[in-house]
Amino acid sequence: MLFTLGWASLAAMFSFSIAMVVWGRNGDGTLNF
């Protein structure tokens, strides 16, 4: 259970970072970090 939860959170963080990179290269500008 704990291993599955950790793996799911790791995959979520990885996909989120990929999405941030894609949005950054897109030059959307709605999210200003």
Curated annotation (Swiss-Prot):
It is found in: Cellular thylakoid membrane. One of its GO terms (molecular function) is electron transporter, transferring electrons within cytochrome b6/f complex of photosystem II activity. One of its GO terms (biological process) is photosynthesis. Keywords: Electron transport, Membrane, Photosynthesis, Thylakoid, Transmembrane, Transmembrane helix, Transport. It comes from the Bacteria. InterPro entries: Cytochr_b6-f_cplx_su8_sf (IPR036143), Cytochrome_b6-f_cplx_su8 (IPR005497). The keyword Transmembrane applies. Pfam families: PetN. GO terms for cellular component: cytochrome b6f complex; plasma membrane-derived thylakoid membrane. The chain crosses the membrane at residues 2-22. It is a single-pass membrane protein. The 4 large subunits of the cytochrome b6-f complex are cytochrome b6, subunit IV (17 kDa polypeptide, PetD), cytochrome f and the Rieske protein, while the 4 small subunits are PetG, PetL, PetM and PetN. The complex functions as a dimer. HAMAP family: Cytb6_f_PetN. Component of the cytochrome b6-f complex, which mediates electron transfer between photosystem II (PSII) and photosystem I (PSI), cyclic electron flow around PSI, and state transitions. Belongs to the PetN family. This is Cytochrome b6-f complex subunit 8.
